């Protein structure tokens, strides 16, 4: 239940997400780096333009394509988006680094905390050398932002 990620203790205790695919026998593991609860209605103060990420091409490229084809402008756009996501997050997890070369997963569900709201859990794929256990130890340092 994604709503549980709105609680810091649950966020810390469930620090990796396994994504199973038809294309691999092994799951891809992701670590959450931000949790955003915001309205998707422009007239609300907490408005967050979530739909821009649904067609954000650099995040749907393969790892090799992303590393070899992003222009400096695209890299800057990705980095700005990551910075905005982190600034809007309910939690701070600064030790989990995220940049334009990472594969990002956004899990979205309806939220009833705000009008027309969506709760979004932003995660990045584990990097080479990381394990679910190693990032779990880092996520334990997460703190509430507000």
Predicted stretch roles:
Residues 1-146:
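Extracytoplasmic/periplasmic soluble domains downstream of a signal peptide or transmembrane helix
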């Amino acid at each position: 239940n994604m709503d549980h990620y709105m609680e810091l203790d649950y966020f810390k205790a469930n620090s990796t997400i396994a994504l199973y695919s038809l294309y691999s026998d092994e799951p891809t593991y992701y670590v959450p780096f931000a949790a955003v609860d915001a309205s998707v209605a422009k007239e609300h103060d907490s408005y967050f333009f979530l739909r821009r990420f649904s067609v954000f091409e650099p995040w749907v490229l393969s790892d090799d394509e992303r590393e070899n084809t992003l222009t400096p402008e695209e890299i800057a756009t990705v980095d700005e988006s990551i910075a905005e996501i982190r600034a809007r997050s309910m939690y701070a997890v600064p030790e989990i680094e995220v940049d334009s070369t990472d594969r990002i997963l956004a899990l979205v569900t309806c939220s009833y905390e705000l009008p027309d709201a969506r709760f979004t859990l932003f995660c990045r794929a584990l990097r080479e050398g990381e394990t679910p256990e190693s990032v779990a130890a880092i996520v334990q340092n997460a703190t509430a932002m507000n």
